[in-house]
């Protein structure tokens, strides 16, 4: 570089190089006939080619000046790029690269690579490395490529969160709040819930097993020594049992979540059994069994859709629940039963034959299951079924008022054998096996009853009008007959209009009807007893008695039944009204408030009539008997005995009318009831000569004919007149 010609020589060479480049560029520009888009190059001066990693719509080489070269997505399908497992492909402008998926790291240390052969990704254990973000209420569990946060044992996710998620936050399992049902006043129930509250305060998840055993024992004590629970009305009992069943299901479901995984069975001293299974949801079926019941269901049914974690399946079976379920109603499938028995079914009397088994699952949405659940319930009795009886699979259905009743919708009996009944149900609740005795309505009997009562009412009305309007027969015995017919008329009218309790609930209307029927029919028997007393004054007391005054007759005839009904209603007002009929309740011997007085009256009248017949026999055996007067007295006695027989027999069968098993006797009662008013009309009106004369007179007056009364010649002796006066012929007339 130090020679004299060095500088000019170097400058000359630089100028020559620049001129050469200018010439080459000029030649290339002149060689390409069209402008090429970005990411492309000219080919042979007439076309363009996209750079590697780009592609045009027309292909690799194109001549369209409007064409463009777009990036090829090597990571999208279809693509020959394979980064291998646990790796993700990342597309770039004109290329791509591979990286390990989240939760994985490269063993080689190279963060990017080109294909599967260079893949060295392996799982990262976030739990052991401390890279997790689990809350301190959870435990970290590593998974392939990730991790999950599980609630600690005895803990559950907070409301709105799920278990086994990265954001899971848990709280310690607590004893659910459970208080007494509102409106139920019972010392036994209050003491039970005080014990429950103490369990709640002392509860620890680690002691869940003991807490469940204590809870079952407390329920046994409540039901075994029910105390004042027995005195509750039927509706309150059913509200109580509904509250107990639903509360037990909720608490046992919650406490079971704190139990270790596996099976658990507990049997109390009172034969109440608790069986449950706690485990991760499996595939196929799960079976839970005990001596009272066995259950088979799909794991998918048992698991809760909104929760993840151990699944709970359990059964609690109690025999003591039947104390609160006595006389519980059964909701019937009326159309199906009508088709079966070819006649409407008004109701059913049920008998509990098994323990009451309550089912609880992790899944709380059990009103409509995806697959049916199978049950086998052990029977405590092996009944022989009679006509109109059936064994049914029933469940306890809660209504909107907190009450409940038995129902069969969604449950089917599959078979019977080996002392058990198998069932299938499409929902879950509390189940039991019932023997239902159906009350099948007999249309013929209903028609006979309605027509017969209408006929009886018509005849009784004629009797009442006759006793009021026919003056020749007025007297104390006619007064007795009048009020007897009035009582029977009012009672029969109420019976015809209001005896049926169609709603099923015993309300004020039904109780009032039962009270009125009780009073009217008791009053009828009281007036019948007064006729026996009248006969006693007439015949036994040497034919000189003048009978009882009307005031005393009314006080006794209406006052005595009023006292009996008043005492009965005051002592036990709930004894009036039944589920199907507005009549006296059979429970607790309340029916004796009617049967007792009626039995006493019938027996008393029978004794009076025996004495009367005996006295008449003595009179006939005298040396100079007054045959005419004795014959009339005998007629009165015979009619009174006939009346006692008809009324007494009618109500002997009438008491059986309300027993669904006595449908044959119900026919007898209906027929006798039809003849009751007709018999009194014939006996005291049509067979009475004076009444017939009045009827004939009225008929002629209506027809417009003049009535002629032919006087009969009688002996004018004073003795004959005195005898007639003594017997009060205006009342006999026969």
Curated annotation (Swiss-Prot):
User: Which residue spans belong to the Extracellular compartment?
Assistant: 27-449, 500-519, 572-593, 659-662
Q: Which residues form the signal peptide?
A: 1-26
Positions carrying Phosphoserine are 715, 730, 732
InterPro entries recorded? EGF-like_Ca-bd_dom, EGF-like_dom, EGF-type_Asp/Asn_hydroxyl_site, EGF_Ca-bd_CS, GAIN_B, GAIN_dom_sf, GPCR_2-like_7TM, GPCR_2_ADGRE2_ADGRE5
Q: What residues bear Phosphothreonine in this entry?
A: 713, 724
Tell me the keywords, alphabetical order.
Calcium, Cell adhesion, Cell membrane, Disulfide bond, EGF-like domain, G-protein coupled receptor, Glycoprotein, Membrane, Phosphoprotein, Receptor, Repeat, Secreted, Signal, Transducer, Transmembrane, Transmembrane helix
**From the UniProt record, which GO molecular function terms apply?**
calcium ion binding; G protein-coupled receptor activity
Task: Provide the assembly information.
Answer: Forms a heterodimer, consisting of a large extracellular region (alpha subunit) non-covalently linked to a seven-transmembrane moiety (beta subunit). Interacts with complement decay-accelerating factor (DAF) and with chondroitin sulfate.
Q: What is this protein called?
A: Adhesion G protein-coupled receptor E5
Q: Which residues form the GAIN-B domain?
A: 265-441
Return the annotated site residues (Cleavage).
Answer: 428-429
Hey, which family's this protein in?
Belongs to the G-protein coupled receptor 2 family. LN-TM7 subfamily.
GO BP, one annotated term? adenylate cyclase-activating G protein-coupled receptor signaling pathway
Domain of life, per UniProt, equals Eukaryota
Entry-linked Pfam families: 7tm_2 (PF00002), EGF_CA (PF07645), GPS (PF01825)
The membrane-spanning stretches of this chain are 450-470, 479-499, 520-540, 551-571, 594-614, 638-658, 663-683
Keyword Nucleotide-binding present in the record's keywords: the answer is no
Q: What is known of its domains?
A: The first two EGF domains mediate the interaction with DAF. A third tandemly arranged EGF domain is necessary for the structural integrity of the binding region.
State the organism named in the record: Bos taurus
Post-translational note: Proteolytically cleaved into 2 subunits, an extracellular alpha subunit and a seven-transmembrane subunit.
Enumerate the glycosylated residues: 39, 44, 115, 136, 285, 327, 372, 403, 418
What compartments host this protein? Cell membrane
Q: List the disulfide bonds.
A: 32-42, 36-48, 50-69, 75-89, 83-98, 100-121, 127-140, 134-149, 151-170, 393-423, 411-425
Q: Give all residue intervals belonging to the EGF-like domain.
A: 28-70, 71-122, 123-171
